[in-house]
């Protein structure tokens, strides 16, 4: 009788534990796949086999800096810079050949139309290349050469204005006037290209990267609940009473 009662209590405890498992434990929530779209500038971690988290190898590029750079029409500005550089090289060569002993032209003696024209051509070519190939290296190279072109145009304008005061050669003054107009134009073009290049570089530097842990878990094992120990029994044997005859 005691053995039957102990077995009944053990079965009732097991049924109670099973009912708690059925009502208390919930299935894991649905997890979205990692192939869903992510906004630019977000890098997601993946868990390796050893449990360590490692970032993905690729990151979506941020196109906002390049859009800022393209607002300034770098291809058109670069084309004009190349033409101005060619004009400087051509007019400088003509002045060098026909000056006929007219000394005192610092613009020619210092080779301003040659190194200035070469600088204008290089900066214009890099601006056109940066619009065709959207790379950070070309963007920074275009920015650096445009800064140099602006400095060269400013120095060339100052030298041309100085030559106007010391040159009495009428033909030379005509060439200097044309070169002054194109040099001032190159200065403003280089400043505009530098402005948009600085904005694009600043936007590229300030682009934030957000690190998100991987949404997948590697262990879906549900811990088994603790089973209560069976009840204690007294060491008393039940002896049925013999029936009297």
UniProtKB/Swiss-Prot annotation:
It comes from the Eukaryota. The chain crosses the membrane at residues 78-98, 103-123, 147-167, 176-196. Residues 1-30 are annotated as: Disordered. One of its GO terms (cellular component) is membrane. Disulfide bonds: none annotated. Keywords: Membrane, Receptor, Transmembrane, Transmembrane helix. It is found in: Membrane. Signal peptide: none annotated. This is Membrane-spanning 4-domains subfamily A member 15. The keyword Isomerase does not apply. PANTHER family: MEMBRANE-SPANNING 4-DOMAINS SUBFAMILY A MEMBER 15, MEMBRANE-SPANNING 4-DOMAINS SUBFAMILY A MS4A -RELATED. Belongs to the MS4A family. It is a multi-pass membrane protein. May be involved in signal transduction as a component of a multimeric receptor complex.
């Amino acid at each position: 009788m005691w053995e039957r009662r102990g077995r009944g209590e053990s079965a009732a405890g097991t049924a109670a534990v099973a009912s708690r498992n059925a009502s208390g434990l919930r299935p894991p929530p649905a997890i979205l796949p990692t192939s869903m779209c992510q906004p630019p500038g977000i890098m997601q971690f993946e868990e390796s086999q050893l449990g360590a988290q490692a970032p993905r190898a690729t990151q979506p590029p941020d196109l906002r800096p390049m859009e800022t750079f393209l607002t300034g029409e770098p291809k058109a500005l670069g084309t004009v810079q190349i033409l101005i550089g060619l004009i400087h090289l051509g007019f400088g060569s003509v002045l060098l050949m026909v000056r006929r002993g007219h000394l005192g032209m610092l613009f020619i003696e210092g080779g301003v139309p040659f190194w200035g024209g070469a600088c204008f051509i290089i900066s214009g070519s890099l601006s056109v290349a940066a619009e065709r190939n959207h790379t950070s290296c070309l963007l920074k190279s275009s920015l650096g050469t445009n800064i140099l072109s602006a400095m060269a145009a400013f120095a060339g304008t100052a030298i041309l204005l100085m030559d106007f005061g010391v040159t009495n050669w009428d033909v030379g003054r005509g060439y200097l006037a044309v070169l002054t107009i194109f040099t001032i134009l190159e200065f403003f073009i280089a400043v505009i290209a530098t402005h948009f290049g600085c904005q694009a570089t600043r936007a590229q530097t300030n682009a934030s990267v957000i690190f998100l842990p991987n949404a997948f878990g590697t262990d879906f094992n549900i811990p088994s609940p603790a089973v209560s120990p069976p009840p204690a029994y007294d060491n008393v044997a039940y002896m049925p009473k013999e029936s009297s005859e």
